[in-house]
C-alpha cells in the first residue's frame, strides 16, 4: 500500500495506489513464478493472432487509459495533501504511519498474494474445476481474514511500543504521539487490502479489468472528497498535525470502498463466498509456497522505502515526507505504463502456463517487455533532463 489503494495498487497502503513500489517489481516476480511451472524445450508455437491477441491488446488499452486517469487523480491528491500539510514533521509522521502497515500489506497481501493465487486459480478454471477454484478462493479469503485480523489487532494494541522504533531523535513528544495515533487508524488497511486482493485476483482471472483499473481512481476521489469534508472538523494546522487524522480516516474509508467495488463486480461472474475453510487443501500450501519469492522481492523494495524514511528522521523531521514525494514523482511513469501491461498480461500468462504453452508465454513476455521499455525509457530520460521544473510544477 503506497498511499494508494491499489489492491490492487496500489496506490494502495499503498492501499493500492498504483504508485506503490511493489507494482514496480510485479512483472519480474510474476514471470518467475509462472516460468517455474513450465518445462524447457520443444518447438515454440505461434501466438494466437485472434481473438486472444486482440483481447489482450484491448484490455491493455482500456486498463492503461483507466490507470492514467487514476494516476492523474492520485497526483491531484498528492498536490492537495502537500498544500494542506506541507512537508513538516506532522506530514512526515503521516508518511511513516502509512509506510509501516503498507509494508505488511505488501508482504502478506496485495500483489504477492495475487501473483501466487492467479496461476493456481486459473489452472483449476482451465481444467473445468470451477467449484474447486471457488472453494480455494473462499478458503484463502477466510484464512486471510483470520490471520490479518489477528495481526491488525495486535499492532493496534502494541503501536505505542512498535512505532517509536522507526523514528530518530528529531521526532519527539507530540510528533511521536501523532505517529502512533495515525498508525492505529491506518493499520486496518492491511486487512482490507488482503481481502480485496483475493477478490480482485478472481476478477482478473476472468479478464475483468475495469473495476480493478478504476478502483484506484475511486480511492483517490473518495480521499479527496472526505479530506475536504472532514478537515474543517479538526482544529489546528501545520504545526500540531491534528487535521491529519481526517486524512487517515479518509484513506481507511476509501480502502473499504475498494473492497465493496470488488464484491459488487464479482456478481458479474456469479462468484459467491462460501463458509468453507479446507485447511488440508494442498493448493493452499501451493499458493503460499509461490508467494514466498514474490514476498521476498516486494519486501526488499518496500523495506528500502521505509528505511529511507527512518534514516530521514535522523536528519530532519521534514525529510521522510520529502523523500516520499520524490519517490512518487519518479515512480509515476512506472505506474502509468508497467502496471497496466503486467496486470492485463498476467492472467493470459497464467493460462499459457496451465496449458504448458512455453513458446507462447516467452513470446508474450518478450512483447510485454518491449512495450514497457518503449514507454519507460523516454519517460526516464525526460525526468532526468527536467527534474527541477517537474517538482516545482507539482509541489
What positions do the PLM features span?
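Membrane-embedded alpha-helical bundles of multi-pass transporters/translocases
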Residues: 2-395
Amino acid at each position: 500500500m503506497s498511499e494508494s489503494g491499489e489492491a490492487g495498487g496500489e496506490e494502495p497502503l499503498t492501499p493500492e495506489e498504483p504508485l506503490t513500489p511493489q507494482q514496480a517489481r510485479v512483472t519480474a516476480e510474476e514471470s518467475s513464478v509462472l516460468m517455474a511451472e513450465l518445462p524447457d524445450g520443444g518447438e515454440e508455437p505461434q501466438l494466437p493472432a485472434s481473438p486472444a491477441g486482440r483481447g489482450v491488446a484491448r484490455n491493455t488499452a482500456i486498463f492503461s487509459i483507466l490507470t492514467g486517469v487514476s494516476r492523474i487523480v492520485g497526483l491531484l491528491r498528492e498536490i492537495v495533501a502537500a498544500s494542506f500539510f506541507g512537508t513538516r514533521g506532522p506530514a512526515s509522521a503521516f508518511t511513516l504511519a502509512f509506510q509501516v502497515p503498507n509494508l505488511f500489506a505488501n508482504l502478506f497481501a496485495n500483489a504477492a498474494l495475487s501473483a501466487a493465487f492467479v496461476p493456481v486459480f486459473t489452472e483449476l478454471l482451465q481444467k473445468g474445476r470451477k467449484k474447486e477454484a471457488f472453494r480455494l478462493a473462499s478458503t484463502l479469503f477466510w484464512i486471510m481474514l483470520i490471520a490479518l485480523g489477528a495481526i491488525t489487532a495486535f499492532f493496534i494494541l502494541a503501536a505505542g511500543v512498535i512505532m517509536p522504533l522507526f523514528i530518530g531523535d528529531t521526532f519527539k513528544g507530540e510528533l511521536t504521539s501523532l505517529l502512533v495515533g495515525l498508525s492505529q487508524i491506518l493499520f486496518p488497511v492491511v486487512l482490507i487490502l488482503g481481502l480485496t486482493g483475493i477478490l480482485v485476483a478472481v476478477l482478473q482471472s476472468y479478464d475483468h479489468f475495469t473495476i480493478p483499473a478504476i478502483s484506484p481512481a475511486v480511492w483517490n476521489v473518495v480521499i479527496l472528497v472526505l479530506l475536504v469534508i472532514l478537515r474543517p472538523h479538526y482544529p489546528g494546522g501545520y504545526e500540531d498535525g491534528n487535521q491529519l487524522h481526517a486524512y487517515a480516516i479518509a484513506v481507511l474509508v476509501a480502502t473499504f470502498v475498494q473492497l465493496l467495488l470488488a464484491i459488487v463486480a464479482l456478481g458479474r461472474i456469479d462468484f459467491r463466498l462460501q463458509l468453507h475453510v479446507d485447511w488440508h487443501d494442498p493448493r493452499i500450501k501451493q499458493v503460499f509456497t509461490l508467494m514466498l519469492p514474490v514476498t521476498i522481492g516486494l519486501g526488499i523494495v518496500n523495506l528500502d522505502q521505509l528505511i529511507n524514511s527512518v534514516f530521514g528522521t535522523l536528519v530532519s523531521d521534514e525529510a521522510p515526507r520529502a523523500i516520499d514525494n520524490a519517490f512518487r514523482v519518479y515512480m509515476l511513469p512506472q505506474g502509468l505504463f508497467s502496471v497496466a501491461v503486467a496486470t492485463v498480461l498476467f492472467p493470459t500468462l497464467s493460462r499459457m502456463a496451465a496449458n504448458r504453452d512455453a513458446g507462447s508465454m516467452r513470446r508474450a513476455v518478450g512483447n510485454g517487455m518491449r512495450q514497457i521499455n518503449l514507454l519507460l525509457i523516454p519517460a526516464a530520460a525526460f525526468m532526468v533532463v527536467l527534474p527541477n521544473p517537474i517538482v516545482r510544477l507539482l509541489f
